[in-house]
């Protein structure tokens, strides 16, 4: 199916395809080289080293991580040459894109694969007090467009997936207005654009990280941060009618969402009927009491909040009309044939690769430790290797324990932190060089930007962690071609796909995480008022521990990730 899609896109001559999975990169590069490749923000490209890797891999554009400041973007632009794209408007995730496992943890639906259940928008309790600790404001950087252009951004990204044509039309029109305005007219353009954006019914706005490393107003626990304009609360329920006093105008045709007081999802519907007193009306003003016919599917209770999430449509073309218009511009079959031929060749090559024998690898157990004192674990039966985080504290311990480590260097794996912003990358380059000079050769990487850390160093064994998001054989082959000698498959993989993946003949061994703390979120958002080690609990009593280190917020599930009951099946 993927190859058919790539063939069709190549035939159409699209301006670019946005890639997250390196398996897609490998197929597109090999069989459809004319396709312009854009790196998704889900690839977590957040430093110059990562962008330079993309350049070498043939990408023409990088969609940068949303956690970067203008200063960091400027530095990346100065050291790289491909096009840079950045988000300017839309919902912000609490987690760094590509590093969130919250949704898959609570629902089995992966936010990394476009199926987020949005558990971050729910209510969590800290010391018995409820709050929306992970619910972020919406990004709105319309007043920073000149600064972003100066920093080197060549393309602005507006969130559009799962949004209505109405929303997209309003937001794009607002940003286009400001972009096209001469400098002397920009103030008036910003005012007019602000009025337009106010009709898109977003959450409270923030500039995100663009103006600094500690963003103001990005997450306020006391505010629900729910999408839309708060109209009031439900005060009566009678004969299918929801009664409330509205604090703004309401029209037939507006779209509402009823949000429960707990952390559950709301129900939405379009207003088709409403009564003022007992009289049907088309509109009411702020301050009036109105009863609205409940056309939603979910249950509604007294005290639930009512939000207006859409107004009178301005984009009126029906989906049927859109499909008819698209059919008129479809390419003739003759234009599509060359790409189809390449698709057949790609499929033949893939099917041939599937017929080989992957063989059976011997069991090998690697244990995750915290510090040098955990080297004693290497004396446990069956433990072949120990993996330690590469931290400043552990580097100091290496210098103090040279004699202890002399005979263990081949059994230690140093784990690079997943995020290396700005000057941190150079610090870790020096750390890697120091360790390599002392005879350490094995390192665990989690990001494309990690690979250049080892440039010029000989006999390095690079291994990919679970954050490399390996879910298919093509992704595994891609990482191998980039220099990796072993890979840990994604912790979001399922039984069926794992079985299929391990049947494939691959030039490098694959590993599976069988037990450990469950990483839920990795974020650059500081959680004010919550100390490192504190536990937040959902309404269902699910616990999540908050840890802060090196400028990052990490959230770990109280319940460990475990496949210990499936070890025999994995073998």
Short names for language-model regions:
Residues 1-45, 63-68, 72-155, 162-571:
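Active-site pocket-lining/capping segments in soluble small-molecule metabolic enzymes
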Residues 60:
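Long, basic N-terminal domains or extensions that often function
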Residues 49:
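Short, conserved phosphate-binding/catalytic loop or strand-edge motifs used
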